[in-house]
Amino acid sequence: QLFSVGFRSPGGETIPRIPVSLTQEQRITFVLERTVIYVNYEVVQTTTGSQLILIRMLDPTPGIWTLQVYRAFPSPPDFHVWLPITGFSTSDVIFLEPDPYTTLTTPSATVPVLSPSTYQASNNSFSPESGRGFTRLGEIKPDFASPGISVTGPGPAGSYENRSGASASAAITSGAAAL
């Protein structure tokens, strides 16, 4: 599959299909908006062998943006879109109809990598923010669950503090694997 993209801004301005460029980042501007979009096409990504389209928006106009995906060949469309991880965009950037069951990305989505899910050990509940499988290729992931909510660990100056998230879960997983 080879895909290309276009956009519709909250104000209704449309950027038609942006042709695939193998060598350079494409800078897209709007007539009526201050938003600038950068599009990078990577036809064969080195880690997956699949196409990657990286989209970066500067000063996006608030509202609903539409991403239009075009395919080059007449076959069923099979693509996935992910938002940046927490902290790389504002919390009000969301998909209107997200799929919560294909959230893992590289490297956790690759077969030889062990991918833990994060859970709260005190009540055995999974973290809603934890990545979930299947992968985009249908592999079953995560491989197991590891504590990652309110995990006590070393802090500054010999103190201890609680941490939560995938990093805490990964630290416990790494320690267990080292044993």
Q: Model-found features: residue ranges?
A:
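Loop-rich non-cytosolic ectodomains and luminal regions
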Residues: 1-179
